[in-house]
Amino acid sequence: MRPFLSGSGAAIPSRRTALTLMAALPLAASPVAALAQAETAPPAPDTLRLFRNLLTRMGVAVALNGGPARTFIIDTGAERSAVSRELAQTLGLPSGPDVMVHGVTAAEATPTVRVEAVEVGRRRFPGLEMPVFPRQALGADGLLGLDLLSRFRLVLDVRAGRALLARPGEGVSVGEAGEIGARRQADVVVSGRRGPSGQLILTRVVVDGVKTSAFIDSGAQYSIGNLALMRAARIAPATNPDRPTRMEGIVGGAVAVQTGQARDLGIAGRALGPTPLLFADLHAFSMLNLIEEPALLLGGDLLTRFDHVILDYGRGRVAFGGLLRHA
């Protein structure tokens, strides 16, 4: 899916260009100022696509039915792994029943295909029914969701730009490519409680002094708080009421979001300082029973502030590495 702001007249032509444009925005201005840059006449709502994460965008090799390895994006916010329509057609995968897929913004009945075996590394998972989406929506041949990721220890090695999947309890190296176990700050390990689909819900997150429940969505570009958090932290909306911002996901329609800036955000005891956020009562919060209490979806904009993040689903723990220094 090519990201765009509605009314701007042009889509961002490529991932590389998108990264360049995003890097040019100062931290305090994004995403609020980025949205404000789109001029329209007459005024029309901005549309912010929840496209596959341009910042983390880490994938792993996955083989279906013994075929050649394909790149599947890691998405810790997706309850089910999915395959692109184009790959399903190429492999001649038979149709399965429609299933209800719960996305960030909505739930939607979605077609599936039957897969005899999914191979991830040396592990083989037989007999899966996988939802099907257009490749441009996924941004890859498929994605790995929590139904499979929860069987692993997942390392998002931001500094080295790679993702690692290990068996629970298996050791992994974190650091620059070719650099074994290099760490500049000790990891901070926090425990999480289990969500309905295996998500790890963390509590060591504080937004402007407000204790906040949070979960990691590695497939989301932006971090999004619910309206209960916005009220509790007394964050003033920055969105122009004449130009409402709307957000679209792969599943379901658009939802209205507000923009604002937290004065101080802390994750696992690490202070991130002033941080721009989006706010909406997303379907994802409802699914996790987090509508009434302050809650935050941790997206790529915050995950990439850390050297690495390790999700150990077997032990119910998340480890955050040191903060990266951004120029």
Question: Each predicted region: which residue ranges?
Answer:
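Pepsin/retropepsin-fold aspartyl endopeptidases
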Residues: R2-I12, T17-A327
